[in-house]
Amino acid sequence: MALLAGLVAPATTAAARAAQGALTPTVEEQRLDKAAPQEILRRSGFDSVAPDFARDLTRTHSFEQARGIVVRDGTALWRHAVHRAQGRGPAGGDLSRDDDRPLYWARLGMTRDVRTWEPDFGIGDAQRSALLDQLERTSRGRSDIRYPSRATGIKRILVTGFDPFTLDQDIRISNPSGAVALALDGKVIQTDSGPARIEAVTFPVRWQDFANGTVERTLAPYLPKVDLYTTVSQGRTGRFDVERTNGAWRGGYPDNDNISSTGTIPVAAPATPPQWTTTTLPYKAIVTAHTGRFPAYDHTEVTEIPTGSTEPVVRPDGPTPGSTAREGGGGNYLSNEIAYRATLLRDRLGLHDTLPGGHVHTPVLQFGAGNTDPATGKITDPQFVRNRLAIIAQLRSILTTAANTALK
């Protein structure tokens, strides 16, 4: 997600999407019928998730019954994906357990079912929207965050990941940050200050969800209660980056619904939001520790419009005073935006000096040699799996290093 600035493709406007009507599947949902998503679902055992959910929906006789089914099945989907990723229960097929894609495509099948469902008892736009919101919340782990009591002495770490994206370029794409979330959710790691429990959630790659406040609604109840947090996304080839600075600018690259958004990141009052926010992760310790096979960098470069100027300038060492953001360290797509929103929320909650938190970019998850052509390639290969497992293991090591340094 890091390096998408300036690569603005033709995009659907929000108004055009709204004009399609409530019962029309989204662009994102329409990809579900392609061969690769269907193979991913079939080879993981997730191909029955949406059909079973649709059957349960048709048996309801009221909105409240439907809401109960959505909460139940959304929660079950998240837990099933976590259990599969962590080696519990049946694999459901020969697709490697660490794969994040079955969850993504199964969820889209469920959201499409809700969006196109026309029950005999009738359902209004607000009710349908409420069901979709509940499905997003439960199937992304947001209603499943469980930390032990402080009396146990166990530290608390929160991690976020993302859905796959740029799927029109390669429908097979996986997102290692989503795989990290599934692999680490509920795990306890050993740190120098004792055990720490990780809880994880995932976010969509959609501008409107962010504008609607999904990041703040998800994180606000927990940032005051955790000891460390890290937002995670896929970034550059062959390297991890701890993003030092985040910028308040959307660069316009289309999201998973092919919708574009350009301008200052829209955040709620109070006060005028700053152009820049900064990490409070112990970046020096992270980049000097041996955490895995990929190098890790303290990434300080941003793009700004300096005070008194109108043209953007790349600053290798971070922003100058009074400048206007055009790219944070993580670019100006949704990875930069979640980093900006989370760190701004941290600061608005008065936690800047007490809560270590910021954004980590993973390496790009690459397919193996001979399997790079989206038109002819397979949905997985041994090198692809090894790369994803290496990224997951190194992110866990990075979290351990951060906790060892910051939670003494």
What are these regions (language model features)?
Residues 330-342:
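Substrate-gating cap/lid alpha-helix
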